From Swiss-Prot:
UniProt-listed Pfam families: UPF0102
Annotated protein name in UniProt: UPF0102 protein NGO_1987
Native organism: Neisseria gonorrhoeae (strain ATCC 700825 / FA 1090)
Gene3D superfamilies for the chain: 3.40.1350.10
Stated family: Belongs to the UPF0102 family.
MF-aspect GO terms: nucleic acid binding
PANTHER family reported in the protein's UniProt record: UPF0102 PROTEIN YRAN
Length: 115
């Protein structure tokens, strides 16, 4: 297993543990479709959260938040729409979030990354 993949998996594990400590329940992990991948899909109360996880060893090159590009955001939005259609989830409150992990700092939960 490549180092980046191991770090990504460890980052997702940490993000999931953090979200579960905040009351979230896992629905899916590494969900794929033609538009891309959603790292974590969780339920928090009555809301479905689609979560992009970004891990960086340090803040060099802008840190974890900097790595969510406009093209990545578009892929995520299309993936979310596809997930909702495929699962026939209409009129279900949902949100696209990010959990950022940098080095040994606690995870940072950014809610509603689409604005």
């Amino acid at each position: 297993m490549r180092l980046n993949h191991k770090q990504g998996t460890a980052g997702e594990d940490a993000a999931l543990a953090f979200l579960q400590s905040q009351g979230c329940t896992l629905l899916a992990r590494n969900w794929h479709c033609a538009y891309g991948e959603i790292d974590l899909i969780v339920k928090n109360g009555g809301m479905i959260l689609f979560v992009e996880v970004k891990y960086r060893k340090n803040q060099r090159f802008g840190g974890a938040a900097y790595s969510i590009s406009p093209s990545k955001l578009l892929k995520l939005q299309r993936s979310v729409e596809y997930y909702l259609q495929q699962n026939r989830l209409t009129n279900v409150p949902c949100r696209l979030d990010a959990v950022l992990i940098e080095g040994n700092r606690p995870p940072e939960w950014i809610k509603n990354i689409t604005g």
